[in-house]
């Protein structure tokens, strides 16, 4: 299945909450696409509920099913609560971190920013969006006019966005630090990760 590139508001309406940074259009029409107004929805099966939750999280991070499932399998093999570790692995992807730091308006834009070589981690170029940062990592925008002009514009546009406590950002030096790994309340809200764990346990 290809990565979704269509209208973001349609995705938000499908899941009943803002996904992929959509805004006012979703607020006007928060009911599912295809309906001409809000109406009661039929009771859905446990399988459908789990599938919906999985798809919602996959859209938020913009991953293909194969990539998404691979991250889940890694989380399942590690110590700790599988669902929480799964979210942690998604949230600490380099593209997600770049987005959270305000260096891109969306995770999709952050993925391009990383892929185009604008980011350094611990002094080394990292152009792999799926790279997982760890506590103590130093992240920096490449010291070039093109990279820093782009970063400056994004930081200005996203200045009202709060950087989560597990990260720190110095906009003047274009440097950030991973203070620690995120806790559950610092990660994606509106997601019931246990439903995703139960969904994948069926296979």
Swiss-Prot record:
The keyword RNA-binding applies. The keyword Ribonucleoprotein applies. Transmembrane segments: none annotated. Keywords: Ribonucleoprotein, Ribosomal protein, RNA-binding, rRNA-binding. PROSITE patterns: S4. One of its GO terms (cellular component) is small ribosomal subunit. Gene3D superfamilies: Ribosomal Protein S4 Delta 41, Chain A, domain 1, RNA-binding S4 domain. SMART domains: Ribosomal_S4, S4. GO terms for molecular function: rRNA binding; structural constituent of ribosome. InterPro entries: Ribosomal_uS4 (IPR022801), Ribosomal_uS4_bac-type (IPR005709), Ribosomal_uS4_N (IPR001912), S4_RNA-bd (IPR002942), S4_RNA-bd_sf (IPR036986). NCBIfam families: PRK05327.1, rpsD_bact. Part of the 30S ribosomal subunit. Contacts protein S5. The interaction surface between S4 and S5 is involved in control of translational fidelity. This is Small ribosomal subunit protein uS4. It comes from Opitutus terrae (strain DSM 11246 / JCM 15787 / PB90-1). The gene is rpsD.
């Amino acid at each position: 299945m290809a990565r979704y590139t269509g209208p973001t508001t349609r995705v938000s309406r499908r899941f009943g909450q803002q996904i992929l940074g959509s805004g006012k259009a979703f607020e006007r029409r928060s009911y599912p696409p295809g309906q001409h107004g809000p109406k009661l929805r039929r009771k859905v099966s446990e399988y459908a509920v789990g599938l919906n939750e999985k798809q919602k999280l996959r859209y938020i991070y913009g991953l293909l099913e194969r990539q998404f499932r691979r991250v889940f399998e890694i989380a399942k093999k590690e110590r700790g609560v599988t669902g929480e570790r799964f979210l942690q692995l998604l949230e600490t992807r380099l593209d997600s971190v770049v987005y959270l730091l305000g260096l891109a308006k969306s995770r999709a834009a952050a993925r391009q920013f990383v892929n185009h070589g604008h980011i350094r981690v611990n002094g080394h170029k990292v152009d792999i969006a799926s790279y997982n940062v760890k506590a103590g990592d130093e992240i920096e925008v490449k010291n070039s006019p093109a990279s820093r002009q782009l970063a400056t514009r994004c930081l200005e546009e996203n200045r009202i966005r709060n950087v989560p406590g597990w990260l720190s950002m110095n906009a003047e030096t274009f440097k950030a630090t991973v203070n620690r790994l995120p806790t559950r309340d610092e990660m994606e809200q509106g997601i019931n990760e246990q439903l995703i764990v139960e969904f994948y346990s069926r296979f």
